[in-house]
């Protein structure tokens, strides 16, 4: 892709999200979403492959439907209140429609079907943007509306997302699809605690973005997209592969890694609010995520896939220069659990 075009596309993506996050007028929020959506489609199609075109088409159709629902919710609320202010969503019908529209943009279950397909059909760099930056704008609107949003609908979608994110990743061999189902599960954890403690949602989002960023950077460094190529990467880059597997376990929420912190704090916060059944179900379904991460780690580190080629160990210092940016990311993604007592004061 031409560097100038790439710069303009990235600038538009950043500008669209910034407009959504800083605007208090519904029309400019909708315009920000549209700018963001139209700018990322060329990023999804930069491989010039039918699979990328299919993924971009699916993304466009889903996001266009969500934008249509967003406009419908804004119109119904405007007829009821006569105001364009984001925080003034007084009509319960428009609040429910808006929640569904934002759930489609986030990829929450039961509107999650596009996330694995689109992520699988795009390059790793575009998948990284899709699973991290693209979550900021819809979540910022949900955070703004958290006092007036429909609690039962959000909790239902959150629990369903955690369950689907665990079940969907069980039989996957494509790492991008595994990351997509992991994203669905993490979004479920975030929206479940959104009503009770919005600050905890922001903390969870930050940790999720750091872990996903680390994982995708490692995948890009090793050019790994399947479990088979991950097992072969062990012979080529043992250190980077070890970092990758540690990050996977952290994303699964295995103590004493960073990913355990948000799950611990969310379960504690839900229990404080006299919710017992919901955190119990979420803790049980979180084991599904941990299972397929541990299965991936086990199959990569303790078993050897059959191969027809004579795989040789590569020179270990080939990727030293590329690993400078990975050091701080790895520390944040795997070693910040001791900071949990300090994070407990967030309300």
Swiss-Prot record:
Bilayer-spanning residue ranges: 1-21, 25-45, 59-79, 96-116, 148-168, 178-198, 200-220, 237-257, 274-294, 326-346
Compartments it resides in: Mitochondrion inner membrane
Keyword Oxidoreductase among UniProt keywords: no
GO annotation, cellular component aspect: mitochondrial inner membrane
A Gene Ontology biological process term: mitochondrial respiratory chain complex I assembly
GO molecular function annotations of the record: NADH dehydrogenase (ubiquinone) activity
Keyword annotations from UniProtKB, A to Z: Electron transport, Membrane, Mitochondrion, Mitochondrion inner membrane, NAD, Respiratory chain, Translocase, Transmembrane, Transmembrane helix, Transport, Ubiquinone
EC identifiers of the protein: 7.1.1.2
Top EC category: translocase
Catalytic activity of the protein: a ubiquinone + NADH + 5 H(+)(in) = a ubiquinol + NAD(+) + 4 H(+)(out)
InterPro entries: Complex_I_Subunit_2 (IPR050175), NADH_DH_su2_C (IPR010933), NADH_UbQ_OxRdtase_chain2 (IPR003917), ND/Mrp_TM (IPR001750)
Membrane topology classification: Multi-pass membrane protein
Domain of life: Eukaryota
Free-text function comment from the UniProt entry: Core subunit of the mitochondrial membrane respiratory chain NADH dehydrogenase (Complex I) which catalyzes electron transfer from NADH through the respiratory chain, using ubiquinone as an electron acceptor. Essential for the catalytic activity and assembly of complex I.
Subunit structure: Core subunit of respiratory chain NADH dehydrogenase (Complex I) which is composed of 45 different subunits. Interacts with TMEM242.
Similarity field: Belongs to the complex I subunit 2 family.
Protein name: NADH-ubiquinone oxidoreductase chain 2
């Amino acid at each position: 892709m031409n560097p100038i075009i790439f710069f303009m596309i990235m600038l538009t993506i950043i500008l669209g999200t910034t407009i959504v996050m800083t605007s208090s007028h519904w029309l400019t929020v909708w315009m920000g979403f549209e700018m963001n959506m139209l700018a990322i489609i060329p990023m999804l199609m930069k491989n010039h492959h039918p699979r990328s075109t299919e993924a971009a088409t699916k993304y466009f159709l889903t996001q266009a439907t969500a934008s249509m629902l967003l406009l419908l919710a804004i119109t119904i609320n405007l007829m009821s209140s006569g105001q364009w202010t984001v925080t003034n969503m007084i009509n319960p019908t428009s609040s429910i429609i808006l929640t569904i529209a934002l759930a489609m943009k986030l990829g929450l279950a039961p509107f999650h079907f596009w996330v694995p397909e689109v992520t699988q059909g795009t390059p790793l760099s575009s998948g990284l943007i899709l699973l991290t930056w693209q979550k900021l704008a819809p979540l910022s609107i949900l955070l703004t509306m958290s006092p007036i949003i429909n609690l039962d609908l959000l909790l239902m979608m959150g629990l369903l997302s955690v369950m689907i994110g665990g079940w969907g990743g069980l039989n996957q061999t494509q790492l991008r699809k595994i990351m997509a189902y992991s994203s669905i599960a993490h979004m479920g954890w975030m929206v479940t605690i959104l009503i009770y403690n919005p600050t905890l949602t922001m903390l969870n989002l930050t940790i999720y973005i750091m872990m996903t960023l680390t994982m995708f950077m490692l995948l890009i460094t090793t050019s790994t997209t399947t479990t088979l190529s991950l097992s072969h990467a062990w012979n080529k880059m043992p250190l980077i592969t070890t970092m990758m597997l540690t990050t996977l376990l952290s994303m699964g929420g295995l103590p004493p890694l960073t990913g355990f912190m948000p799950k611990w704090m969310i379960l504690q916060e839900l229990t404080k609010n006299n919710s017992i059944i919901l955190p119990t179900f979420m803790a049980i379904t979180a084991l599904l995520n941990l299972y397929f991460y541990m299965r991936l780690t086990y199959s990569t580190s303790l078993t050897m896939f059959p191969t027809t080629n004579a795989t040789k160990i590569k020179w270990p210092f080939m990727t030293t220069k590329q690993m400078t940016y990975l050091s701080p990311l790895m520390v944040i993604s795997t070693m910040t659990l001791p900071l949990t007592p300090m994070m407990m004061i967030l309300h």
